[in-house]
Amino acid sequence: MQIFKFGGASVKDAAGVRNVAKILENVGYANTLIVISAMGKTTNALEVVVNSYFKEQEKLAENIQVIKDFHYHIIRELFTDENHPVYWKVDGLFAELTSFLERNKSPKHSFVYDQVICFGELISTTIISQFLNDNGIKNTWIDVRNLVKTDSNYRDASIDWEETQSNIRTHINKSLLNITQGFLGSDANFFTTTLGREGSDYTAAIFAYCLDAESVTIWKDVPGVLNADPRYFEHTELLHKIPYKEAIELAFYGASVIHPKTLQPLQQKEIPLYVRSFVNPTAEGSAVCNVPELEPKVPCFILKKDQILLSLSSRDFSFIVEEGISYIFKSLHKAQMKVSVIQNSAISFSVCVDNKFDTLAELLERLEERFKVSVTEKVTLYTIRHATPAAIQTVETGKTVLLKQVAADTVQIVVA
């Protein structure tokens, strides 16, 4: 069995949906499960809905209408029959979204976020499943929330592997083409949970692990895994073969092509991960697999923008040792801060973090009880794997270096 994953960019419009059908016809879809993300920038648009629910109720209906208009435009291009069942199915999903927002009593942002954000994937898979069925690619639509079970850590849930594997092996018919949603799960109370932004790759890996799949293929708008993001670097190179360990390192440091959690379940069963272009589906792409070293072995650049650099120092010039460092990390964990790089000396501690949950104020309140804290926002973190002097110079030229850390062949540089 094989697992395919199509991200939002691949299904951002009617042409993208038709291209998915063409790819399936050309590469084959027997014994396949397809994981699909929300269309285009729908997740971002649903985040606007969540924010307006909490802060600008008067804009709530308008923001939902924007998402409706976007999807109905795609539906009208794909389905000529105005009485097609896809209309009432999508109508029902939007009604469910509106009903939740009217009934909800929870003040918890992360809980509301997950109950709202899931509609992007539910709507996209409904449209695509219907279109494929109409065009001779018969498939079964599956609500992934009935299969992937998690804890209740909304927005970044952890998988209950035992229950999830039992559900998937019981309910997935390997002989059929199955279509399901990425990024989503549900907790013990059947409330929707999410696996972290860009978590659809992880969903594909979960299914691959549980079904002992032969491979996972992620279809993207790039030719494969490049050694740098072409939006920010010139003369990028395609990485043809990547060892699992190297891919995990790249993902950990923030390489955007592969979700960090995706690789661990695949490595455990040595399931190869292919990254291929939906623009040029006949091209070979990249393979993450059981090879001894990176091919070609070149410096790899990872860029993370909009980071926050926190510089802590003790108020009385006492050492920042185990107890103080423990307090710092407990505070970071409580604020759901993702640590990108740390550096410490006897009386100072610097940490670069990703404030994706908007909890900086909460974190500072705790840290300032114990330390003097300096905050530098909007910094950029560069990580270079297999760094060379020339690669380091490429990053540092013309920039103000705030922090630099060198470990083996990995260099991390924070710049203003």
PLM feature spans:
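Electropositive, surface-exposed helix/loop patches at the edges of structured domains
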Residues: 172-187, 250-274, 311-325, 376-396
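A conserved regulatory-domain signal marking ACT and ACT-like small-molecule sensing domains
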Residues: 284-416
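Structural motif
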Residues: 1-2, 31-34, 72, 138-140, ...
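A conserved active-site cap/scaffold subdomain adjacent to cofactor or substrate pockets
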Residues: 241-289, 294-296, 305-307
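Nucleotide/pyrophosphate-binding catalytic subdomain
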Residues: 1-255, 263, 389
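Conserved dinucleotide-binding and phosphotransfer motif residues
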Residues: 135, 269, 335
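Glycine-rich beta-alpha junction loops
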Residues: 38-40, 222-224, 277-282, 292, ...
